Design a protein with these regions (language model features):
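Glycine- and other small-residue-rich loops at beta-strand/loop junctions that grip anionic moieties
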Residues: 15, 45-48, 115-119
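Long, charge-dense
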Residues: 55-113
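Charge-patterned, long linear interaction tracts outside catalytic cores
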Residues: 118-158
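Structural signal for hydrophobic packing residues in well-ordered secondary-structure cores
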Residues: 30, 63, 86, 134-137
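Glycine-rich, highly charged phosphate/nucleotide-binding loops
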Residues: 18-31
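N-terminal, Lys/Arg-enriched amphipathic/low-complexity engagement segments
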Residues: 1-19
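Ordered, amphipathic secondary-structure segments that act as subunit-interaction surfaces
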Residues: 31-58, 63-71
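Loop/helix-junction capping segments adjacent to catalytic residues or to phosphate/diphosphate-binding pockets
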Residues: 20, 49-53, 76
Length: 158
């Protein structure tokens, strides 16, 4: 979706539940798009598919664009949950998670709070972009449309 909110394409991908391939899956989707006009990447959630951690810094460095990971609620962290679900291999997941750093709380012009991790842009630039892309509520339009499409595909019976 472009910043003028025109939908101009989709790409689909997947990552392994409980795996370590979310970052590579996102990079693969970016490459499949083959679009030179992309100017930023938004990701809804940085820890997806049962603790499959997205490395926003690596993605930003590889594609040379700003990457903004968006979450909608404050949390106390997931360290204990990672230890619980991965008792024999939690060290590597915790190391990957700690590399993400802390989230920044921002308030949109809609008065909703978001929590972001940003690479390749400042918090101020990320806030400006998210304000522009959020028409109502807390979910920026590109992420809202992506979630609608994903939910529809999950429910579809071909």
């Amino acid at each position: 979706m472009s910043t003028d909110l025109i939908i101009d394409g989709f790409v689909l991908g997947h990552s392994t539940v409980g795996g370590d391939d979310a970052t590579e899956a996102i990079l693969s989707m970016y490459e499949k798009l083959d679009r030179p006009d992309i100017s930023f990447l938004l990701i809804s959630g940085i820890v997806i598919s049962l603790y499959n951690i997205v490395d926003v810094k690596k993605i930003s460095e590889k594609i040379g664009l700003p990457v903004i990971g968006v979450t909608y609620e404050d949390s106390k962290g997931i360290e204990d949950a990672i230890k619980h679900h991965f008792p024999k291999s939690y060290d590597s997941k915790l190391a990957e998670y700690s590399k993400l750093g802390t989230r920044e709380k921002i308030t949109l012009r809609t008065s909703y709070d978001l929590y972001i991790r940003n690479e390749g842009c400042t918090v101020s630039e990320a806030t400006h972009l998210l304000d522009k892309l959020t028409l109502q509520g807390s979910v920026p339009e590109p992420l809202r449309i992506s979630q609608l499409l994903a939910n529809t595909l999950l429910k579809a019976k071909f």
